[in-house]
UniProtKB/Swiss-Prot annotation:
It is an enzyme of class 3 (hydrolase). It comes from Stutzerimonas stutzeri (strain A1501) (Pseudomonas stutzeri). This is 5'-nucleotidase SurE. Its cofactor is a divalent metal cation. Binds 1 divalent metal cation per subunit. The keyword Hydrolase applies. The lineage of its organism: Bacteria, Pseudomonadati, Pseudomonadota, Gammaproteobacteria, Pseudomonadales.
């Protein structure tokens, strides 16, 4: 089996190397990852310039594009053999609740939804790599069992791992996405020459993080697995919209 590995932290990220090392003796793994950190890139595709793959000394392929670019090229002609599945991560930082809308890690997995196998996005709840070995172990264990899964086509599994040693993990829970409140306002700042700019600020506080959510699971020491689908249609809104549209045309 052939696995395409991507991420959004960049080709030099320790989480990417940890994921590759965890899977390299299980399948034929190829890494295509952004040359620079592309956190928050979501599902952006680069359309205004050409993309140039670069072979790295460790055998990884770096790309001057987004995480989605990496998977798009990796599945569509960049590689000699088309990968059978896509695994993304390991992200240093959580991708919980609304985070999945912005996450390049999750977006890379979403771009891998057409392979016929589940795509995985792995995230560790820390900006530091101290417990990457825990997330790598979980990634290997889950990917190894993927052929026993019976899921609808184009399912993406977002996996968040608590920042704990493996023997402190309490188990694994299936979860739904929680929700955050509105993000904190951007921070206005002037550079040394007096030109003002803005920094995107931190995510909002947890607003919906009760039992059953991804937030709750990881805070209790459990690995959270949230199945995602591309269809974001809000069907409960149909009734209100139908009455609103009466007599418009």
């Amino acid at each position: 089996m052939r696995i395409l590995i991507a991420n959004d932290d960049g080709v030099y990220a320790p989480g990417l190397a940890a994921l590759y090392d965890a899977l390299a003796d299980y399948a034929e793994c190829t890494v295509v990852a952004p040359i620079q950190d592309m956190s928050g890139a979501s599902s952006a595709l680069t359309l205004d310039r050409p993309l140039h793959p670069v072979s790295m000394p460790n055998g990884f392929i770096g790309l001057n594009g987004s995480p989605t670019d990496c998977v798009h090229l990796g599945l569509n002609g960049l590689l000699e053999h088309t990968p059978d599945m896509v695994v993304s991560g390991i992200n240093l930082g959580a991708n919980l609740g609304d985070d999945v809308l912005y996450s390049g890690t999750v977006a890379a997995a979403i771009e891998g939804r057409f392979t016929g196998r589940p795509a995985f996005a792995f995230s560790l709840l820390s900006r530091l790599p101290d417990n990457l070995s825990t997330a790598a172990y979980i990634a290997r264990a889950l990917v190894e069992k993927h052929d026993r899964l019976e899921l609808p086509p184009r399912t993406v599994l977002s996996v968040n791992v608590p920042n704990l040693p493996l023997d402190h993990i309490r188990g694994i829970q299936l979860t739904r996405l929680g929700h955050r409140s509105r993000a904190k306002p951007p921070v206005k700042q002037a550079n040394p020459r007096g030109k003002e700019g803005y920094w995107i600020s931190v995510a909002g506080d947890v607003e919906d993080g009760g039992p059953g959510t991804d937030f709750h699971a990881v805070m209790q020491g459990y690995v959270s697995i949230t199945p995602l689908q591309l269809d974001r249609t809000f069907r409960e809104a149909f009734d209100g919209l139908e009455s609103w549209l009466e007599n418009v045309l």
